[in-house]
């Protein structure tokens, strides 16, 4: 993308507006493709960690969703989609949302956890923060 953007700027500054437009459109197309590939990768990661969204196959009234490995925006989108699917199926119960604590993130700082906390607050889902068996935190429990 920087190549196309650089070339678009260069062409514009030299007065070649047609080339500038072509390079700019190329940059936009490439950016859209990159975004789509990121979305697909996030979906694959989510699907590999969450094999079912059908609470009826779960004998208890609990449902777990694991958001490890996702970027914060992807994690919020996946949680929003999952909550919507569960509500549409009439699910009533406890949902455990695993975010992790950032131990595998750059700087060892949680990124998904605060994004999910903010999302839950914004949409009015009351959540209780908890911890997994390792005692590190990185989990929310919400009632649906």
Where are these regions (language model features)?
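Long, charged, low-complexity intrinsically disordered regions
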Residues: 1-144
């Amino acid at each position: 993308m920087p190549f196309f953007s650089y070339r678009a700027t260069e062409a514009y500054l030299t007065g070649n507006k047609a080339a500038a437009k072509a390079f700019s459109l190329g940059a936009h197309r490439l950016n859209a493709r990159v975004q789509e590939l990121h979305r697909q990768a996030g979906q694959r990661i989510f699907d590999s960690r969450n094999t079912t969204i059908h609470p009826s196959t779960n004998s208890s009234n609990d449902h777990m969703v694991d958001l490890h490995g996702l970027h914060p925006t992807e994690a919020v989108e996946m949680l929003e989609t999952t909550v919507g699917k569960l509500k549409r199926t009439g699910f009533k119960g406890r949902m455990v949302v695993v975010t992790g604590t950032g131990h595998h993130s750059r700087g060892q700082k949680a990124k998904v956890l605060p994004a999910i906390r903010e999302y839950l607050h914004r949409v009015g889902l009351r959540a209780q923060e908890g911890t997994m068996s390792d005692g590190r935190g990185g989990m929310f429990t919400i009632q649906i």
